[in-house]
Amino acid sequence: FNNTGSLVICFDEEHRPALEELYQRGLSNHVPGLRIVEKEELHEMEPELSDQAVCALYAPTAGVVDPFTLAISMAENAADNGVEFFFNTPVETIEKTETGWLVNGEFETKLFVNAAGLEADDLHNMVCEEKIHIRPRRGEYFLFDKDAGKMASHVLFQQPTAAGKGVLITPTAHGNL
């Protein structure tokens, strides 16, 4: 875990109330150290940031991990603690039992992890009364050379809109962007 902190950037004074609403939501979720930074401090924190940025929501406890190493470590830890993996085994049915769950009429378990990605709603809807629907969003990732890693030291988010999070810039655990 690299503790980089994150900034949600506001590019227009008209959008400041929405940023302050995000700040209030963070406070109610007990995000430590959360604060709004003004233009001068923001540009001291991120000198390469556009001059159009007027303020930002700063979360000093945010950070980045290497997702591949994290996933492998979690799987290794789970295996060390007796978890059994059933790869390439689609879940077709889940039934609640007195002691847990019966999956596909074959596997009995006290717990199961919903790691179905974009199909997680299908699995959720098999076991929960309240139904959900995941609406996937397309995105693109660009991985820059380590030389570009010096251009940003925090995770940088555009202020979210109804359409989504927009573009974000994330330093990697290995020093890239």
Question: For each predicted feature, which ranges?
Answer:
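Active-site substrate-recognition segment that forms the wall
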Residues: 1-2, 111-177
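Short aromatic/hydrophobic contact patches that present stacked aromatics
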Residues: 6-10, 56-58, 141
